[in-house]
Amino acid sequence: MTLIKRMIAAVTLTLAAAGFTVNETALPRPVERAAIMAALVVMTPEMEGTVYEAYPDTGGVWTICTGHTKGVRPGDVATPEQCEAYLHADLGQAVDYVMRAAPDAPLFSKIALADFAYNVGIGALARSTLLQLAKAGMHELAAQQFGRWMFVAGRDCREPKNNCRGIPIRRELQRSVYLVRL
């Protein structure tokens, strides 16, 4: 099963457990948040990977677990339980921001925006043309914006020598998820 199909299944099951379907609009905020989180718990670890010892990421930022950066120092070690807690807290911040910033965006667009915010930072999303287009309901144009975010620390991640090939793969996945309509 593809990653997107697993995400759709996670969203569908979460909504069904709350008595809703994926075709419903105006979901209650807690239900929508739970559905977005369910998809991200599938998507984000697949893109980030999980490492229990601190390491400098491609951009030189000290990172641990599944992309957690806040307060990480060389030599830090985390348990699987700590990593899970970091992931849920960090994803929750991204989801809460996206739900406030783009409340009218379709569900899967919010999932893609939240993963993007998790990856590049809420501030970067807040200043982006991507978010402005999403808020304006210009979803085809917004989806094209993911392709503009291919650089890490000034290096073009489309170039194999720059050791960040996962970024173009992730941006294409985000673009595809952004456009999912069920």
Where are these regions (language model features)?
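Structural recognition of the beta-strand scaffold that forms the well-ordered cores
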Residues: 43, 63-65, 112-115, 141-145
